[in-house]
Amino acid sequence: MTYKKLYSSTIFNRELELSQDYNTNSTAFQYDFLSDDFDLNRDSSNFKMPTSLFKNLRDDKPIIFYMNPPYGTTGKLAKDGTAKKIDISKINLFMKANHYGNASQQLYAQFVTRVIKLADDFDLTNVYLAMFSGIRYLAGGNYWLKFDQHFFKQFTYKYGMIFNAGEFSGTSSMWPIGFTIYKLNKNENNIPKEFELSIMTRTDSSINNVGTKTVNLVEKDSLSSWLRNPAITGTPMPDGSYPKLTSAMKESKRNNSRCTFYEGSMGCLMNSANNVAEGTTNGGVWLATSGIYHDHGVNVFDKNFDKVVADFAIRRSIAPTWVNAQDNFTKPNTNSPIYSSFIGDATVFSLFDTASNQASYRNWNGYTNCNKPGRWINQWFFIDQGKIETEAMRKKQNDVAYDAYGDKNRYVYLKLQNMTLSKEAQNVLDLATKLYFKQLKYRKKAILKYPDMSLNAWDIGWYQMKLIDRVFPSKVMQELKSAIIILKEKIAREYAQDLIEK
C-alpha cells in the first residue's frame, strides 16, 4: 500500500530498521513518543520530530495515529513483593498531575494520552486513532474509570475487533488483543456504556469473523465491589509482628506490607482486579493465613467469610479462554435457593485449590496470632482437634500430639458442622481427612525432611499436606485431587459461569 505521507517512529533503532524495510517510502525517525517534544505546540521552533511532520500538525492536516504500544506498567510487583522498574515518562507524570487515575501506570494508556495531548496542543480537528492493545480499558471498572472519562470525552468509538494474542510472535495465546478505531470528537458528552467487538479467528487460508462480543465500560454489580463492601477492618497488627506472605511459606522482600493485617483476622484473600484471567492464569487470587505483600488483600473475618470463599471459588473455578479472559464477574444472588449449597461447596474448595496457601506456623520469628509466641494457628483447618490428639498419641507422633494438647477446634471445622454439604464437597472433605490420618504416621520423618515447614503443627494446611505427599506419596492424594477437580467443575458449571458479565 502506498501512502501520501507516512511517518514511522520508535524508540529502538532495530525496530526502526525493520520499519524502513517494510515501508521504504516512509519517513522513519527514532523518537520517544512518551517524552520527546513534550511541550510542543504550533508556535514551537525547536523540535525533534521531522520538520514536515511538525508542519502537518501545525497546519491541521488529517492524521491517523496507528499504534501497537507495549503492554506493561511502571510499577508492577513481582510475586516476591519486589517491583521491576520501567522508566517514568513525562506523559506518566502528566497523567498523574491531570487525574488520569490508576491507569497512569499502564504504558498503552500513556501512548493514547500523548495522542490526546498532541490533539489539544495543536488544536487538531481531523484525527483518527487506530491501535492494537489490550482491552482492559474497555472493561476495567474503577481502575480505568478516570482514564476512560478523559479519553471518551475526546474520541468516539468507530470499530473494534479482538483476536488471539498468540497471533503475535512470542505472546501468550490465553488472552485477547483488540484492534480499535476512534475518531476525534472533542467535548463528546455521550460516553458509551458498552462496546461491540468482532471476534476474529485465522485459519491457514482465511481470516474469519466468528461472532461479536459485548464489553461493558462500567461494571454491573461487580463481584469485587460486593466482596469489599462494606469494608471490614479492626485494630492493625504492628509491622513486624506477622508474616507478610508471597505464598504459603515465603515472606515478602519488601519492608512494608501493602495490605494492613488486623487483629483477629483469619488471613487474607489476594483479590486482584475482577476478570477471569487475573483470577486463574495471572495468579491474582489466592488465600493465606496471614498478611500478604499486595495492596489487593482482603482480611478474613467471620462477618465476611462467606463472601471471601464465594469470591475465591467463583474466580478460581472458571477455565479462561482467550475470548473470556478479560470478562468481569458480577456478584452472586444471595437470595437464590442454591446460594447456601454454593457456600458449602466454596468453603471446602477454598481449602484445597492450588491457590489455597493456608498454613500453620511454629517458631517462625516469634509470630503469633493466639497470644502464644511462636504459634500461628490455621483457622482454616477442617478436622476435630480431639481426634487428632488421640490418633497422634496412638501412632506415637509426639510432636503433633504435644502441639494439639489443650488446643481447641478451628473456625472452619466448627463452621462445617453446621453445613449440609453436596456429595461432591463431602467427598473432597472425606478424602482429605483420610489423607491427613494416613500421613500422620510419617510426620516424624517429614519433620526431619522439612525442618522449617512447621510440620509439627496439628492444624497444617493444604500446602503442608502436599509437602508430605512429595516424600510419602499416597493413592489417596490422587483420589483427592480428582475429587477436587470434580468439585471445581461443579462450581464453574452451576454457579460461576452465570456470573460472567454478559
Residue ranges and their predicted role:
Residues 96-164:
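Conserved Class I SAM-dependent methyltransferase catalytic core
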Residues 1-38:
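Conserved S-adenosyl-L-methionine
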Residues 139-141, 153-196:
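Class I S-adenosyl-L-methionine
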Residues 251-502:
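C-terminal target-recognition/interaction regions appended to catalytic cores
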Residues 174-244:
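Flexible, glycine-/basic-rich loop-and-beta segments that form/coincide
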Residues 1, 32-35, 44-90, 108, ...:
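Conserved proline-anchored active-site loop of SAM-dependent methyltransferases
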Residues 17-20, 40, 75-78, 139-147, ...:
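A short acidic (Asp/Glu
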Residues 214-270, 274-277, 284:
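Helicase-associated low-complexity regulatory tails and linkers flanking the ATPase motor
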